[in-house]
Amino acid sequence: MTNIRKPPLLKIVNHSFIDLPAPSNISAWWNFGSLLGLCLVIQILTGLFLAMHYTSDTMTAFSSVTHICRDVNYGWLIRYMHANGASMFFICLFLHVGRGLYYGSYTYFETWNIGVILLFAVMATAFMGYVLPWGQMSFWGATVITNLLSAIPYIGTTLVEWIWGGFSVDKATLTRFFAFHFILPFIVAALVMVHLLFLHETGSNNPSGLISDSDKIPFHPYYTIKDALGIFLLLLLFMTLVLFFPDLLGDPDNYTPANPLNTPPHIKPEWYFLFAYAILRSIPNKLGGVLALIFSILILMMFPILHVSKQRSMMFRPLSQCLFWILVADLFTLTWIGGQPVEHPFITIGQVASIIYFVIILFALPIISMLENKLLKW
């Protein structure tokens, strides 16, 4: 057995997945890392097979997707696995980030910051992928979101036209989006390796937030079997979605070919961007909205700076727990608002929810943490 662990490549695998010392008390919330790895593999494989049949031309893109679904062997399955795989990816991502916030994993600066960059990269990939079927929502989503860059002073308009490759979203835009959508997942995979590299420098956090060096167990067989259960449950949920409700999370407008002369009644992105879209729409000023949109994700990088509690995890901090779950409820509210038309009362609800989002993170959590520090001495 020791001989198997000697070759350089196998040594890397061994140190990462077999003999890796892991805390003995990590819960099911630590399963999402491996599930995200599975989602990435599914997305790259299904995407590769879709790319074999897809054509990135405005005249034939929509038809090629139809051709994949109707004429290619199991093309419908590959297409729906890819579309719903993105949704599963983001569900796991949000839960993974939420776990990091709850248990204070953000104190591993490098791992956390690479993770936030990963989140941005995956969001960019998903956005460009949504444009490729060239349906109504693809076209108008691309137009609206890329047009936001025109809010940048001086260079905005030129930048947008440079990204479009013309004066509107057209053939050049679709071709370059396809090229970027193809290459980005491999960049994401490389970033994942860096993410794991930094994680294995420090070791995993655990629910208590305490140093667990005195109580480590080998990753295999304990966590390999635990991850296998997580993978089985994810695949069960995923294939139920793909085979029974493939269009549940999609937009019916995207079954209409893109038409620059006809605007859909409600332009909205995929469900996983709705919370950020609601924050964007809640600010009347264009540049302000764009900055709020970017900052709503970038604010994750501020968590290590804003952490003032003497305890790392929220496990023993009931007041912070309360705020955390209010934040989760607020994000659900923002997601709902993002999918609603821009009219009363949704505008006001969106503005209030956006303010609550930033207030909780920037002010409420640090203040409550300081109060809890005081209560420790009580």
UniProtKB/Swiss-Prot annotation:
Residues reported to bind heme b b562: 82, 181
Short name of any one Pfam family annotated for the protein: Cytochrome_B
Membrane topology classification: Multi-pass membrane protein
GO annotations of cellular component type: mitochondrial inner membrane; respiratory chain complex III
Positions that bind heme b b566: 96, 195
Cofactor note (record): Binds 2 heme b groups non-covalently.
InterPro entries: Cyt_b/b6_C (IPR005798), Cyt_b/b6_C_sf (IPR036150), Cyt_b/b6_N (IPR005797), Cytb/b6-like_sf (IPR027387), Cytochrome_b (IPR030689), Cytochrome_b_C_euk/bac (IPR048260), Cytochrome_b_N_euk/bac (IPR048259), Di-haem_cyt_TM (IPR016174)
Entry keyword Transcription: no
Coiled-coil ranges per UniProt: none
SUPFAM superfamilies to which the protein is assigned, alphabetical: a domain/subunit of cytochrome bc1 complex (Ubiquinol-cytochrome c reductase), Transmembrane di-heme cytochromes
Keywords, ordered alphabetically: Electron transport, Heme, Iron, Membrane, Metal-binding, Mitochondrion, Mitochondrion inner membrane, Respiratory chain, Transmembrane, Transmembrane helix, Transport, Ubiquinone
The keyword Metal-binding is assigned to this record: yes
Cofactors demanded by this protein: heme b
Subcellular localization, as worded in the UniProt entry: Mitochondrion inner membrane
Family: Belongs to the cytochrome b family.
Miscellaneous information on this protein: Heme 1 (or BL or b562) is low-potential and absorbs at about 562 nm, and heme 2 (or BH or b566) is high-potential and absorbs at about 566 nm.
Function: Component of the ubiquinol-cytochrome c reductase complex (complex III or cytochrome b-c1 complex) that is part of the mitochondrial respiratory chain. The b-c1 complex mediates electron transfer from ubiquinol to cytochrome c. Contributes to the generation of a proton gradient across the mitochondrial membrane that is then used for ATP synthesis.
Quaternary data: The cytochrome bc1 complex contains 11 subunits: 3 respiratory subunits (MT-CYB, CYC1 and UQCRFS1), 2 core proteins (UQCRC1 and UQCRC2) and 6 low-molecular weight proteins (UQCRH/QCR6, UQCRB/QCR7, UQCRQ/QCR8, UQCR10/QCR9, UQCR11/QCR10 and a cleavage product of UQCRFS1). This cytochrome bc1 complex then forms a dimer.
Name of the protein this chain belongs to: Cytochrome b
Native species: Sciurus aberti
